[in-house]
């Protein structure tokens, strides 16, 4: 017969309560997975999962199609697929709305924007930034350029501008140049009457060395009409009153210091000499203007 257990049938055992984990020893509870609501792009623009998966699928399809195709067919198919991806992103807000140009003067900005080839609502992800940079660097104002895409709708063009140094006249043609003698083709010389005028073959390359020295001498600078390059070796300075100052081919700075000293002592720039010859470091030669007697007509060129 079955054994009899006193006290009736056994009661089910209650599970022991687990002791609370110590803050210092327990493992942190795993975080709950966040719902994939949006995949955020730069500057706070979101892509829905549907759009993101569509783009990923298009990119994968592009790779497979191009792998199966060869030659011009692959190029055409690849370009078509890229346009499709661009259009997908563009529909999500990746279209060009703003172009920021930094480091350029107001005069140069219009030329830079035109050369860039950028246009409103252009797909921003598909644009070739290297190509944009090459076009911008083709502008005469631009010494160097950097192009940055700022998603979703902005492009930044940062440039190092060539500062206009002088107007160069050669063979009857006038051009604006920078300190390296580089012609700024987009600059209209008529819009820069404040720039000094340099004349002659080689004047464009040599102007960057002599003009700062002249600019640092206000009395000479304010009287200067033009600087003429002679035999691509030296300078003649033509003043507004018709005077001519001849500089040596070597050590122009010493000759200008000598002119400073004469002007401080004798105000030689106010004396109206026809010529001041500084080519000989040991001697300054001057030639007065031809005197005209009362009632006598002046000779041509006097």
UniProtKB/Swiss-Prot annotation:
Signal peptide: none annotated. Residues 1-41 are annotated as: Disordered. Residues 18-38 have a biased composition (Low complexity). It is found in: Cell inner membrane. Keywords: Cell cycle, Cell division, Cell inner membrane, Cell membrane, Membrane, Transmembrane, Transmembrane helix. It comes from the Bacteria. One of its GO terms (biological process) is cell septum assembly. Residues 72-302 are periplasmic. It is a single-pass type II membrane protein. Residues 1-50 are cytoplasmic. GO terms for cellular component: cell division site; plasma membrane. Its main location: membrane. The chain crosses the membrane at residues 51-71. Residues 94-162 form the POTRA domain. PROSITE patterns: POTRA. Essential cell division protein. PANTHER family: CELL DIVISION PROTEIN FTSQ. Belongs to the FtsQ/DivIB family. FtsQ subfamily. This is Cell division protein FtsQ. It comes from Caulobacter vibrioides (strain NA1000 / CB15N). The gene is ftsQ.
């Amino acid at each position: 017969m079955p054994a009899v257990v006193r006290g009736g049938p056994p009661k089910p055992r209650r599970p022991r309560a687990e002791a609370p984990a110590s803050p210092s020893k327990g493992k942190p509870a795993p975080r709950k997975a966040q719902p994939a609501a949006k995949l955020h792009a730069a500057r706070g623009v979101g892509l829905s999962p549907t759009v993101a998966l569509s783009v990923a699928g298009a990119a994968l399809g592009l790779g497979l199609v191009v792998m199966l195709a060869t030659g011009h067919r692959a190029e055409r198919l690849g370009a078509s697929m890229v346009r499709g991806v661009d259009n997908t992103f563009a529909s999500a807000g990746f279209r060009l709305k703003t172009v920021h140009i930094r480091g350029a003067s107001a005069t140069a900005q219009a030329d830079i924007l035109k050369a860039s080839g950028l246009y409103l609502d252009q797909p921003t992800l598909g644009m070739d930034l290297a190509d944009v940079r090459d076009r911008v660097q083709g502008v005469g104002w631009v010494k160097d350029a950097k192009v940055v895409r700022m998603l979703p709708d902005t492009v930044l063009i940062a440039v190092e501008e060539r500062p206009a140094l002088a107007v160069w006249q050669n063979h009857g043609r006038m051009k604006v140049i920078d300190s390296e003698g580089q012609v700024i083709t987009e600059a209209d010389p008529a819009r820069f009457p404040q720039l000094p005028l340099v004349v002659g073959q080689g004047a464009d390359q040599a102007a960057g060395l002599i003009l700062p020295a002249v600019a640092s001498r206000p009395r000479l600078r304010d009287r200067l009409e033009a600087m003429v390059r002679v035999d691509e070796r030296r300078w003649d300075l033509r003043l507004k009153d018709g005077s001519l100052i001849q500089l040596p081919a070597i050590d122009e700075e010493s000759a200008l210091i000598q002119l400073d000293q004469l002007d401080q002592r004798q105000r030689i720039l106010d004396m109206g000499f026809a010529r001041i010859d500084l080519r000989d470091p040991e001697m300054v030669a001057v030639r007065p203007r031809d005197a005209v007697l009362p009632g006598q007509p002046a000779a041509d060129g006097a």
